[in-house]
């Protein structure tokens, strides 16, 4: 059997590193179909930190796409597993037959599914991408994204799968003995990316709570974002006193980020699509409820796991937040499907489907 090749077709360092390390640590030892990778970006020590993987790095999307297409044409039995698919050339290859449907398996990350960019080139490309998506062999995604995708592509096979968020299962009970009282701290957004709509989110938080809460805005990622960070800071200072606004411009290491999250009482995410599952998982693990946009279909995954969900359209106050905290504390977090190690079973099944071992 031809070994499955995994494709990380865009230079998204944080996510790519997470996927590679997950495969190296959790999957590669037991499956030959979890070892071959083609990645856009620099090595930056990844090969050394993932010794069980065979990783080929490419300088850009185009060079990787050309290599994938060449492999696909040379051997029609070769199958590819695309982790997030932001590479236009690969969509066009699927649409034109350069890559066959039986060769194309796609794990939806979120931004690669929704059509939120307003630029002309995106508006011209989106219809072509929709046509190509009809030809995917199988999609893997959250429950909410599967539902969203099925509305326009009902004939494409869909399977439940969660991004392998870095988590320590031993921390699942860490919040149970914590007492929450006094001024609330609210986390706004999961990164410095503009898709978080930070300014709109800050205004929404202020409308709900006024200047009675402390707001923390993590913006250390992506890099070279100083102008936008300052824009958010100034907008925040028009709404909140300086002591109640903390805009973080430095990237935090994982343990420091966990410590930050544990100091919060609520996560507030205004974006209208699925994103930031990693931060949501870590907040839920810490017993911290989250406010979502009703257009973000991840609420379906949360309710399926019997987790409380608050919405940006709800009338929120401290009593409602504290009640959501109490409800969350009563949930057995060891049973949540999108937590580690529970998502591992989904990955094992995904590999079996993509290789044809499971019909």
From Swiss-Prot:
Catalyzed reactions per annotation: beta-D-ManNAcA-(1->4)-alpha-D-GlcNAc-di-trans,octa-cis-undecaprenyl diphosphate + dTDP-4-acetamido-4,6-dideoxy-alpha-D-galactose = alpha-D-FucNAc4-(1->4)-beta-D-ManNAcA-(1->4)-D-GlcNAc-undecaprenyl diphosphate + dTDP + H(+)
Gene Ontology BP, a term: enterobacterial common antigen biosynthetic process
InterPro entries, alphabetized: WecF (IPR009993)
Pathway: Bacterial outer membrane biogenesis; enterobacterial common antigen biosynthesis
The keyword Cell inner membrane appears for this protein: yes
Membrane topology: Peripheral membrane protein
Entry keywords, A to Z: Cell inner membrane, Cell membrane, Glycosyltransferase, Membrane, Transferase
The UniProt record lists the keyword Membrane: yes
A Pfam family matched in the record: Glyco_transf_56
Family assignment from sequence similarity: Belongs to the glycosyltransferase 56 family.
Protein name per UniProt: TDP-N-acetylfucosamine:lipid II N-acetylfucosaminyltransferase
């Amino acid at each position: 059997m031809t070994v499955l090749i995994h494709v990380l077709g865009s230079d998204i360092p944080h996510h790519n590193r997470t996927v590679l390390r997950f495969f190296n640590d959790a999957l590669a030892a037991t499956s030959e179909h979890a070892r071959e990778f083609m990645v856009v970006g620099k090595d930056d020590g990844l090969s050394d930190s993932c010794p069980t993987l065979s990783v080929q790095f490419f300088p850009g999307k185009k060079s990787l796409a050309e290599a994938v297409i060449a492999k696909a044409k040379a051997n029609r039995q070769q199958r590819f597993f695309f982790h997030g698919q932001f590479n236009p050339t690969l969509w066009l290859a699927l649409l034109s037959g350069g890559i066959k449907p039986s060769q194309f398996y796609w794990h939806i990350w979120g931004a690669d599914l929704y059509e939120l960019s307003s630029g002309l080139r995106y508006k011209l490309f989106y219809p072509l991408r929709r046509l190509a998506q009809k030809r995917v062999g199988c999609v893997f995604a959250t429950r909410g994204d599967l539902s969203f995708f099925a509305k326009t592509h009902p004939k494409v096979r869909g399977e439940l799968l969660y991004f392998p968020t870095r988590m320590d299962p031993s921390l699942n009970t860490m919040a149970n003995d914590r007492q929450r009282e006094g001024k609330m701290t609210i986390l706004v957004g999961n990164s410095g990316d503009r898709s978080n709509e930070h300014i709109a989110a800050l205004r929404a938080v202020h409308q709900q709570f006024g200047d009675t809460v402390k707001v923390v805005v993590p913006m250390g990622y992506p890099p070279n974002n100083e102008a936008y960070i300052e824009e958010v800071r100034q907008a925040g200072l028009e709404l909140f006193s300086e002591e109640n606004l903390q805009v973080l411009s430095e990237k935090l290491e994982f343990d420091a980020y966990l410590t930050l999250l544990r100091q919060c009482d609520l996560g507030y995410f205004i974006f209208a699509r699925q994103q930031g599952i990693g931060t949501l998982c870590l907040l839920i693990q810490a017993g911290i409820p989250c406010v979502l946009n009703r257009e973000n279909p991840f609420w379906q995954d949360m309710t399926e796991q019997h987790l409380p969900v608050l919405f940006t359209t709800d009338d929120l106050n401290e009593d409602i937040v504290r009640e959501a905290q109490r409800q969350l504390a009563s949930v057995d977090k060891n049973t949540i499907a999108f937590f580690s190690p529970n998502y591992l079973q989904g990955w094992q099944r995904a590999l079996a489907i993509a290789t044809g071992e499971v019909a």
